[in-house]
């Protein structure tokens, strides 16, 4: 799909859907909400294809089905009943709401004929309608967060451009860029359509930040793409292919020019080098990257070869650097192409540099470009679009026509600049060719080209080619000439180069003067060219004279260049400096005219050169250029020198006026003649660094426009400069690089060149002693500030003056004095203005923003300071001081404008702490943003990181996709492949089924095991404890029964032996030993029933069994009572108190029938209190126990049966009495509720039964009390009391009662008090009843059992009397005791024992019999023993029955 997308993009017409912002919107909607709306999936290329109108012969004039389906679904989703055959009519109706004009067009022409923009806008409108008219969709969307509904840009670059990244399901990539404040989509552009373009874009973005990457990439790619234009990568990308072509052409041009350039530059490039070096110094800042780009591929080879050639040629030391420069210049044209391809500000300077080569038209172009540079500097503070408009006005009008192919209006000026830069590079290459081949022609053409660039770009290029051709023919002669006079001719060439470059710098000022200057240069150069052998001598003479004239003119041109630089600076500082610059320009132009006349006169001694140069210059340039052309070389050179030197001077000259400018120019002309010689040497270096100089010029442009680019360019040029300087040092060429004040920004590489250039200067001085020039030290080291640059220029001028003739020395002295004055004035002006500009340079010096630049600059400074420590150190110190003074105001000046004003509007980056004014950003911010804010460089880095992640992810996805496709392709030839894949799945499925079956079987087995384990657990658990309980219980019971430990056997006889004993005694013993085990035994019995209960756990079984067992005890009592003494129960006289206590005891008995856990707890709690009082009385009641023990045999016989029956009743009762569970918390309420329920049960059973029970209760209350007390004692002992506890209770007697009673009142005041009161009178009456206690105890048991029967009968239906009629062996002794024990004894035990123990045991019992048994293991075991005895008795009785 990616290839298809690329093909579609290539074939797409200008109205390609991919270039429309709506296309990205629709794609984003389809990707985000397509599945939700069930829309057809359309990858990017497919959507582009269907939206584009197919050719008439394709598709039969039908709209693609995919597009129709998409529209149909979208319209139907918003409630339109659309049919497939009439969908266009419905679409027209919808379009009426959206755009009536389009609806009319569609109605007339049909959907197929509509423009892509219209189709996309309609499709976007339909998509947006979903949010309003599709209710179902709307409801779903309303739940989403707004941020999740939107696609956010992936990042922003240094220039404020937003990058949008989209990826579809087929891994097709689209990346778009646009201005942040773009409202109409005018800046929208698609820059990436496939993976490779994404990688290229990422490389370009990285190169902008990391100059090393840029350098490497540029070396790898001749294309200037790699030296990215800071402003628009989009333009770069679009222009990349044309740039590559242009680069190839420029390389070819350069290769052709190289022989010519090498020969011409042997002489002419010396001059050009000086000028080029100056320009390079200026340009290096800006041009360094483009220069590097140019140099990167061609330069390494060409420069190395040239260096070798230069080293091989002794005389060509001057020429050698020229050759190097020629190749570098060739690289420059490449770079210019690249820079042109990349709409970088590099163009103007490069064009200026190339302008030297091409024509006066180019010179005019260069001047316009310089003006544009100034504007760019000024516009750097203006929003991009405005800048672009202004730049397009400035640059595009002169340059655009042939060169610019602007992708977007904003980028047009960039492209224009790039193209101009390419032209300048070509011009530079021609300059180099001319310099090597035809020095005179080169100079002339260079000046012509410089003059011409303002006028026409095409003629410049034409001249460029002509120059190459011309340079070819004279190249040989000139090489020969250069051998003899190479140094002088080179100096003249350098002068012309410098002049051209000065013109470039001062181009806007010089538009008028540029033509004349270029003509002068052309004359001088052509005169030199015309006189190949002697003329070169003349050329050298002319160059010296021209240098003088140039020095005078250079004062003017330098003032102009200064004004240019001042203007360039002023845009940086703000447009304030322009008016003085304009004045300077006017003065400079006037002075130039006068100087041009003077220079023409001075040059007249060389009439041949001048006329020829004028002829050539007139051809390319204007007649003015012809007139002033000979001095124009000087002027250009001087302008270059002066412009570099005299940016300050320009300001000062603007203040001083035309006259002062003229004076300065005269002095500077002298110095410049010397300086031109120096610069010729410099031109050798500069042309080696020729690329660097245009790069600097462009760099200055770029600096003004984009500070970001400057660093990489400078860094790259720094390396190139070092190489060039090393070559020049070998050659012995001395370079004086004058740094224009505007290039305050570190031209660190030029600085590096300066120390090397000084060495080369020394070498060249030795070689060029005939010339007698002392090379100026390059002011680049101090370039960051205009003051330093001027000071350095002055010092360099001083050095030159010393090495040169006395006239030159005088001129240098005058220039020094003038420059000092000018420096003072300019320092005042520039301190106010330049200092504003300086903050940029200062900031860069501080390294806060352009760290790379400053690193290089610091290195260069260190190198330069090594050679120039005396001058540079003081100057740098001054710069630092001025910078510190400015920075002292604010630690963080704006990194964009360098001004610390309005600190409240300076935003600090959250990652690097760089400060930026809100108005200096692009687009400017009106408010301080919330949250994190990152400066443009940091945003650029983040963008690179994110794009790199996306690229890696894309590579992974594409690899997977490719593998899948390969697999499919392979499988196509294997028919069984699919089947081969499926069969393994089927066996897997069968295995899964088998596993499932096994799992199901296992689960069933687990279930069975679970049930069996329940039974097993209960059985094994109970039997273990049961055996132990039997042993322990039997031993204890036997010991107690025998009067303390008479050991009987553990066989049944011993158990049945208890039958002879009083049940009370046995029960007491059992109580003491086994409090809970009885429950456990009951639980076991119950668990037998429970085996049918799936839900019941062992714990529940035990609990229920215990409760049932207790209830069964009560029921047994009832049966026994009714059977044995039905009459006695009536005979017993009832006492109200006793009846109350009996009633409570009955409640307690019944209590077990209620939910077991609660009932146990309640019983334990309540009986504790009630029967704690009875404990003392029970001691006196042992007689009654004895009498009961007589009946123990009978009880034991029928006890089990009655238990079973009662347990059954208890089950029923449990159902009825689960309500009591609520009253666990309050025993009082439980008791009351129990009483009420019992009463209710009595009523239910029968009123008669109730009456009989009441009468029985009243009669047998006292007896019942006594029996209950004994039973309570037993219950206590069995439930929770160890024998020691019981003994203590018996011993303490009343005190224990008091304790328990207190506890009772605390816990259950109402019910317990009532019971306690009833119990107390019963106690009082007990002594009376003692004689008849035996029977009475029986009776109360009977009575209780009868009452319980009534309560139980409520569940049953029969009357309790029926039970009394039933003949059962008397088990009263045991059953009533046990029942009472369970009901009463346990709670009494609780009351007697510490509440903690009682509660703990109760909770344990309630939670599970196991817990209860463990807690009171011996007691429970005894209880179990009793239960076992009961079972044995029952078995015996049943056998007897």
UniProtKB/Swiss-Prot annotation:
Principal subcellular localization: nucleus
Presence of the UniProt keyword Transit peptide in the record: no
Extent of Polar residues compositional bias: 215-227, 482-498, 552-562, 1394-1408
Residue numbers carrying Phosphoserine: 227, 392, 397, 429, 473, 524, 570, 604, 622, 629, 748, 882, 1096, 1098, 1105, 1221, 1223, 1226, 1258, 1277, 1325, 1336, 1345, 1359, 1375
Source organism per UniProt: Homo sapiens
GO molecular function: histone binding; histone octamer slider activity; zinc ion binding
Source domain of life: Eukaryota
Compositionally biased intervals (Low complexity): 864-873
Complex formation: Component of the RSF-1 ISWI chromatin-remodeling complex at least composed of SMARCA1 and RSF1. Within the RSF-1 ISWI chromatin-remodeling complex interacts with SMARCA1. Component of the RSF-5 ISWI chromatin-remodeling complex (also called the RSF complex) at least composed of SMARCA5/SNF2H and RSF1. Within the RSF-5 ISWI chromatin-remodeling complex interacts with SMARCA5/SNF2H; the interaction is direct. Identified in a centromere complex containing histones H2A, H2B and H4, and at least CENPA, CENPB, CENPC, CENPT, CENPN, HJURP, SUPT16H, SSRP1 and RSF1.
Modifications the protein undergoes after translation, according to the UniProt entry: Phosphorylated.
Record protein name field: Remodeling and spacing factor 1
CDD domains assigned: PHD_RSF1 (cd15543)
Numbered residues of crosslink Glycyl lysine isopeptide (Lys-Gly) (interchain with G-Cter in SUMO2): 136, 215, 236, 243, 248, 252, 254, 277, 284, 288, 294, 305-306, 309, 323, 327, 337, 342, 358, 373, 381, 390, 400, 405, 415, 419, 439, 456, 463, 468, 498, 565, 662-663, 670, 677, 698, 709, 758, 768, 795, 799, 1039
Stretches with biased composition (Basic and acidic residues): 234-257, 274-283, 330-340, 359-378, 467-480, 500-514, 565-601, 609-621, 753-770, 789-802, 816-831, 1335-1344
Subcellular location, record wording: Nucleus
Segments forming domain DDT: 17-84
One Gene Ontology biological process: negative regulation of DNA-templated transcription
Crosslink (Glycyl lysine isopeptide (Lys-Gly) (interchain with G-Cter in SUMO1)) position: 277, 456
Modification N6-acetyllysine, positions: 1050, 1339
Function of the protein: Regulatory subunit of the ATP-dependent RSF-1 and RSF-5 ISWI chromatin-remodeling complexes, which form ordered nucleosome arrays on chromatin and facilitate access to DNA during DNA-templated processes such as DNA replication, transcription, and repair. Binds to core histones together with SMARCA5, and is required for the assembly of regular nucleosome arrays by the RSF-5 ISWI chromatin-remodeling complex. Directly stimulates the ATPase activity of SMARCA1 and SMARCA5 in the RSF-1 and RSF-5 ISWI chromatin-remodeling complexes, respectively.
Zinc finger annotations (PHD-type) as residue ranges: 891-941
Region (Disordered): 215-283, 330-385, 467-634, 675-887, 983-1007, 1063-1428
